[in-house]
Amino acid sequence: MIPKNTKKIIIYLLRNLEIVNINQISKNLEISVGSAFKILKELEKNNLVLSSNLGNAKFYQINLNNEETIKWCEILLSEERRNLKGYSKIYAEEIQKFEHSELIILFGSVLNNKDFNDVDVLFITNKPKEVTRFCLNLSKIRTKPVVPLILKKEDFIKEIKNKKEVALNILKTGIILKGESALLK
């Protein structure tokens, strides 16, 4: 069992691609600096996070070159999906059934509002027609329409490298429904 604050820190570092210092981590996650320091020291010792010194501050980022880190991240991302509640869980179970996609991320208002107008989903695939057909069929059975954002893998990688706000927001706030390992690669 992974402690709650350790989970928070690993997920935060995974979702925020830039390097961050301990004060940013503790402020954004509402964890004491001492607790964050202790956790990060342990994660660094186990080679799950990398640190670098810039001036007087130490900056951290997730170590995705370590197989153990990737396994931890996959488990934590799967746990996030399992902990979905309400409408987001209902839609997630249906959307996960789509087979022609490497990566599926649920994002937007469905995750945090009871009053949502549509269900936003990112599909990483080379088969846009199948996605459109699937989403139209799902929209017919459910009360709210499923709005797909369809990208090819190369385009999504380019969006992230170019720090496009939409792609980064999806990574920061979205729930991975399928393809945790594809995301981590």
Where are these predicted regions, by residue range?
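Catalytic core of pol beta-like nucleotidyltransferases
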Residues: 1-100, 111-116, 125-185
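Short acidic amphipathic segments
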Residues: 101-107
